[in-house]
Amino acid sequence: MKGNELRQAYLQFFESKGHLKLDSFSLIPENDPSLLLIGAGMAPLKPFFTGKLVPPCHRITTSQKCMRTGDLENVGRTARHHTFFEMLGNFSFGDYFKKEAIHWAWEFLTEVIKLDKNRLYVTVYPDDQEAYDTWHNDCGVEESHITRLEDNFWEIGEGPCGPDSEIFFDQGPEHGCDDPNCAPGCDCDRYLEIWNLVFTQFNKMPDGSYEPLQHKNIDTGAGLERLASVLQGCKTNFETDLIFPIIEATAKCAGVTYNENPNTDVSLKVIADHARAVTALISDGVLPSNEGRGYVLRRILRRAVRHGRLLGIEGIFLTPLIDVVVDILGPGIKSIAEKQDFVKRVVQNEEERFNQTLEQGLELLNSLIDTLAAEKATVVPGTEVFKLYDTYGFPWELTEEIASERGFTIDHEGFEAAMKEQRERAREARIKEDAKVATPDITFLKDEELLEDEAVTASSVLMIGKGSERLQTAADGDEITVIVRTTPFHAEGGGQLGDTGFIVGPMGKVEVHNTKRLPEGTVYHIGTVVEGSISEGDDVALEVDTNRRAAMARNHTATHLLHAALKKVLGEHVNQAGSLVTPDYLRFDFTHFSPVTQEELDQIEALVNEEILKATDLAIAEMSMDEAKAKGAMALFGDKYGDVVRVVEVPGFSVELCGGSHVGNTAFISSFRLTSEAGIGSGVRRIEAITGRAALDAAKHDRLTIERMAGELKTKAPQVEERLHQVLAEAKETAKELEQIRKEVSAAGAADIIAGKVMIGDVAFVAAAVKASSIDELRDLADMGLDKLAGSGVVLVGAAMGDDKVNFVCKVSKDVVAKGAKAGNIVKAAAQVAGGNGGGRPDMAQAGGKEPAKLMQALKAGGDELTSILQ
């Protein structure tokens, strides 16, 4: 029975027993901060077990996606360890109990999937006579096949708990140990656990006593992959049809054979398991990052990439495997099938990023371990582990795994200290930035009622500060902070800059440069006395720069529209990671895994402008946080909210919690234009945009530019693009002609270099120092040289390209590759002599070095490497 058929058979069987079949829940727990990822079938159903939520049915069955990474280092080294797996389960919430659970488990195993009854064994809790009798008297399980084990009791601290009963499959004495009393519960591989039935019937009290539960529950779990291995007669889960096609695809890519080399098999299993894991995680919305679930994903993905390198795979290989994973799991898991392209884009982006630093990081680590070994040390310093993490993207667990393969451990405390030091530096930098404007002690204002009202135009001065000093009077030229009783100025927050304007008193004027808020909420104004003086107690006029505020309102509302448009075009994984709203432009940082394409940018810009043209009135209201959540409001990055929140809604398009300035109608934004998009960190992108007059001015600038180009190209503006294509085509044709001339020159050079051909055994080998101005020329020479050898042999060419640069290219014909020669090894040996490195495919590789003077020595080293391979 195929794995997908087994899943379907299980779910259909329990549907026939009155269970509601639910699709697998996401791997991301919903409203459960105690869990990082779902690791068991019952985990997403916990609210039903605890009574917090009423289940849609008192009988439920699922095939739940699960993720466990506690034993990551064992994955690939044992028959059963996985990160990702599916847990088949049937559950009862105060409905049926022990007898039915046991009867149905036995019926499914023996009648539906037809396992041999004589090879099934069960264990029960010693005091659970009801379970024992049900197995023996009702199901007919022989007493010799029932074992009482103290371990068969499920509990985690106080709360619901109860005995459980495990079902085992006897794999045969050849899998067992020498103990004549070997039975279920033994540590050997003979008895394989395939199903666990948990009978939740007690409540453990604080004093350690157990009281019967009023409503008893059933929680069962059977690993799909494990059950499939039994049905398909496989030695390990990895050989089932749920996983083995991924191993086959990986082996083909690496040019290796499964089940020939134990170390190779470990890497093949690791990659197969991890390909399933990253597919499931990303399809559920997890993206690579350096914390939380994102770190789990990054750690698994990069571990897979590293094992690909151990197999000799160069370049991208994990991304194509996603197609194989989807072919297997897609029919049974909708989310995986629906997100195939999205998953591949995320994996390719992360794979490319790690490949850029992997080789350097591995070299550094191996060199470091060599040095430590020479010094008789056995611990990799924490500072070096941190360097690999910070500079080369090595999760510390990956460094630990590589180190352990060579008999080393890592200094965990030193690594944590280095991490803490980096965080402290970042925190101090933030504190320094925040402390640029000092304010005096304002505790004397604690009994004052300070208000904010944008309609107010007059108030009184409560406090003046200069640095940390409180002033009674500030004179012309003083840079000060001012607190008034009621202010119409908006404080900086939510990414929006603070208001500017003037505070005008009877004796002078203060120009307000910015408005901020102290941690406890008091609004203060930062400014300079530009006329006369100002004193505490003065009655003052408050003049906000309303034109500037209106410009920020346009940009702030446009930011909300942009956020919503990003989610609609790129996906719901997009979240705000920072923002800046100024009068002149807006900046928006968001989580996304790859550069946004021009087509996507065009869609985003068009969506925002469509909302502007709809002239929609904004709905702005205060409400409870629960009400806001019910409306689907998005909370913004870095903001903290009280019980009552302000909700800004563009009906039908965007709902966010926000305290900033906004237009009353989207039409007031006038126009929206994207100006840039770029990455600013791992998994974080930045968009900048303009609105209103600035957007219109930019459009005018573009029009004038096109008109000038039309003049230069001697055409009219509407035909500029067509004419430009003509000019570029002509230039391309000229370049092709020049390239043909260059190739003819190279062909002549190729004829010269094979004059130095030597035979290593029956293999023709050419190593030559040539003149070339680019790596493309070197590749051409190598190609032509191999052609001159009648397509059989090895060509290694090198060229100095400046005082401190030398490049190499190696080509190996397929028949010589079959003899064990790999271009990557040959070119690497050459480049290392010249102070460099490189690699590539078995048939073609290139490398670079820093010491052109050693070119001839390097070519000789390449020949020596080939000789050692062939002999």
Give residue spans per PLM region:
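A glycine- and charged-residue-rich anion-binding loop/surface
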Residues: M1-Q871
